[in-house]
Amino acid sequence: HPRSSAASDVYKRQGLGGSGIGGKIATQIVADQLKIPAVINNDYTMPKFINENTLVIVSSFSGNTEETLEALKVAQKANSEIACITHGGKLAEIAKENDYNLLILPKAFSPRAMLTYSVIQQLYLFNHYGFVNNDYVEQTKATVALLDKEVEDIISTAKQTARALQNKTFVTYSESSMEGVIVRFKQQINENSKALGWAHVFPEMNHNELVGWAGGKEEYAVIIFRSSYEHPRSSVRIDICKDIFKKHTSTVLEFNAKGDSFLAQTFYHILLGDWISVYLAELYKVDDVEVEVINFLKAELAKI
C-alpha cells in the first residue's frame, strides 16, 4: 500500500524476543536519518501517546505471540497506521482481514534464525513510509560480500572466544549505538548456549555498573564490541575501563567491526556473536535449537 499521510509523527515498533530485537537493530542502523521519535515496545500494552498519526510496525514470527497480539488491539483502537511482519498465525489473519501492509517471513526453525529478514524488512518499511532513503539496499549487498570474505576468520575467532567464555559468566559491552548488537549477543548465548550473563552500554554503565566492578571476579569474561562509529568520548571511556576490568579478570576480549557502513559493522558483529554462541553450545554439549523451557511457559500460560 502507499504511505498513509497520517503516519508522520511517531514510529512505534512492537515485538518480543527474536522477533523484537530486529526492531532495535533496524532503528539504530537508520538513527542518523530518522526525524521522528522511534519507540521499541516489548510488552502487552502501548504508550498512551499513540494515535492516528503513529506508524506501528508489529512483528511476530509465529504470528501468535500473546503480548504482541494484545498490544496490537491498542494500536487498532487508536486507529494507528499498522504494518505487520510475520510468518503466519493470527497476526497474518488480522493483517489480511484489515488490509494492513503485510510482509511474510519464510519458514524457519526459530525467530532468532530470521534476524536478517526482520531487519531488512523493517528497513524496507522505513523507506516505504518515507522516513529513510534506500541506501540500505547497496549497503546490504556490500555487507553480504564482506561477510562472505570474512566468514572463515570470523568462525576461527568465534571458536577461540567460545573456549575463553567456557565456564565463565559473560559480560558484554558496547557503545550505545551498538546496543542492539550486544542484546542480540546476550540473547544468543542465553538461548543457544543455555548460559547466563548480562549486557550494558557506554557511557551509561560508567554512572552505575562501573562501581559494581569493585566486586569483579576472575569468573567473569568481558566481551567488548567496538565500532568506528562510536562517539569519540565514549571510545576514550571504553579504553580507560578496559584497564579497570583487567584488574578483576584476565578475560577481557575486544572485537573491532569491519565494514564501510554502520549496517555492515552491525552485521559483522552479529555474525561473530552468533557463531560464538553456537561453539559455546558445543562446548557445553547442549542443543542450540532447543528452547523447551519457553514452550513449557507458553503451555502453562495457555491453561490460565
Give the predicted meaning of each segment.
Residues 287-304:
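Short, small/acidic-rich helices and loops at N termini and domain boundaries
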Residues 9-148, 227-232, 236-251:
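Glycine-rich phosphate-binding loops that contact phosphosugars or nucleotide phosphates
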Residues 40-43, 195-206, 251-260:
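A generic structural motif
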Residues 6-8, 127-221, 299-304:
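Active-site phosphate/pyrophosphate-binding segments
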Residues 1-7, 11:
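Single conserved hydrophobic/aromatic residue that forms the stacking wall/gate
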Residues 27-28, 69, 119-126, 183-190, ...:
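Predominant activation on well-ordered alpha-helical scaffold segments within soluble catalytic domains
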Residues 18, 177-178, 204, 227-230, ...:
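Short, glycine-/Ser/Thr-/acidic-enriched flexible segments
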Residues 211-292:
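C-terminal active-site/capping subdomain that shapes the small-molecule cofactor and substrate pocket
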